């Protein structure tokens, strides 16, 4: 709604590339063993992480891990009624029984300004309906995702609103699904068991904004709207907590430089 409002008021926006996909969960013990070795004392090393990338065979797309949460949990993060999106987090000790991470596919910037946002919203609406319209998340084992069939019974998940079996191919973007499938096959070669022990919980749509409010890189002010300073994730200049905070520090330092009364 904010993007539409800004556009109606004449604020300059532009389409940008972003990424969408799913969240995957695995037993943390599997990730620990594959990444650190059998018998390692996790109390000394901490829970293991992974960073994975794979290019599709035709080299037109890719899949990669993002925001991996060792010993973490999955959480809902819908921002509109009738939509569903997931995210992941780890508590400070990172000692939960499950690891989760986003596995996402690049979405190129579109020629039409709101095409990326429209696709994002459609996937979130489809997910809400596939989950039973009660904010339960549609889920599928990676093994059955590759076979394009629903599960009868799902393994445990940390997602707080519960999960329901769903064939993701029936409601997610087919290009995203195809790239994810190739990615999973590649990742299983790097982390054996990634397919057999993996559960998909969908969707992960909020890696970054599909739109950017254009700004002057030096002043951080909108290019055509005086007094509007844009920063952080929603404005299209960050992809997470730390990068958003860093963008805020830039603006604070600039304001302090121009106004000597700021302590």
Spell out what each predicted region is.
Residues 1-263:
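Residues forming the flavin
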């Amino acid at each position: 709604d904010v993007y539409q409002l800004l556009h109606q008021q004449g604020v300059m926006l532009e389409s940008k590339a972003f990424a969408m996909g799913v969240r995957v969960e695995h037993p943390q013990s599997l990730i620990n063993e594959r990444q650190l070795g059998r018998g390692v004392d996790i109390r000394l090393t901490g829970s293991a992480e992974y960073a994975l990338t794979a290019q599709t065979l035709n080299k037109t797309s890719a899949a990669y891990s993002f925001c991996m949460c060792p010993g973490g949990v999955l959480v809902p993060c819908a921002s509109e009624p009738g939509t569903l999106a997931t995210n992941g987090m780890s508590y400070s000790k990172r000692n939960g029984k499950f690891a989760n991470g986003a596995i996402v596919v690049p979405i190129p910037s579109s020629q039409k300004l709101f095409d990326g946002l429209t696709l994002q919203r459609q996937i979130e609406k489809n997910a809400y309906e596939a989950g039973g319209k009660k904010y339960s998340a549609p889920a599928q084992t990676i093994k059955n995702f590759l076979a394009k069939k629903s599960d009868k019974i799902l393994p445990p998940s940390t997602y707080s609103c519960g999960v329901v079996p769903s064939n993701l191919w029936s409601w997610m973007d087919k290009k995203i699904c195809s790239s994810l499938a190739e990615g999973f096959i590649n990742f299983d070669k790097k982390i054996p068991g990634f397919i057999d022990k993996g559960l998909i919980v969908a969707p992960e749509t909020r890696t970054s904004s599909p739109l950017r409010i254009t700004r002057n890189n030096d002043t951080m002010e909108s290019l055509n709207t005086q007094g509007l300073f844009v920063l952080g994730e929603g404005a299209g200049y960050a992809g997470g907590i730390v990068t958003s905070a860093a963008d805020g520090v830039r603006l604070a330092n600039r304001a302090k430089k121009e106004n000597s009364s700021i302590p």
